[in-house]
């Protein structure tokens, strides 16, 4: 389970290192009636793990990577338009030297960006990857860790952080299926349509068995 560290606290209090995000950028958005924040590692994560929720609107979605990738940036903003939500992309690396980045060189900047996001206003709900990174993706786990650390610092005593639901492999799903609440048929159909028509650069077939489930778990419940 992620725990708040002194390092995170020191980073938040520091005014020396600046991340990629500035308050002036957030000021350009109309966030008065936008009370829910979703933070994801990659474009399409917002749809795979939270598309049904996004259809309820009212979300500001922040993607940490691929802001410099023309195709993936275009797909991300097209998806948000379909959901009727606002959002932005940062440009932390997905890959470095052909390998998946562990973000070790960028942690300080990411934490500062997250602190700005979480304290820009008091969000009613904050959603992000779960501590296991769904199927174990290192950048999903890192996103969860850093968001949780900043949340603990900025939202003490509150119950506003939610993790994406637990991931189950194909052969595991039948054992737990009865305990999961599926999306409504209309939401699943619309979510699937958006993913299929917008994210043409990505192959998400291997995650299809989890598409109908978005059983988010509160920070408190995950700890129990």
Describe every region a protein language model picked out:
Residues 2-121, 149-156:
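Active-site rim/loop-helix segments in enzyme catalytic domains that contact anionic ligands
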Residues 63, 89, 125-129, 159-165:
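A structural signal for short, well-ordered beta-strand segments and their strand-loop junctions
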Residues 48-51, 135-142, 174:
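A short acidic (Asp/Glu
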Residues 66-68, 94-95, 132-134, 167-169:
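Short, solvent-exposed loop/turn segments at secondary-structure junctions
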Residues 154-224:
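The feature marks non-catalytic terminal segments
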Residues 42, 129, 137-140, 198:
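Histidine-centered active-site/metal-ligand motif
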Residues 115-118, 122-132, 140-143:
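Proline-aspartate-enriched helix->loop->beta-strand connector
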Residues 131, 135-152, 158-160:
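Catalytic domains of cell-wall/extracellular-matrix polysaccharide-remodeling enzymes
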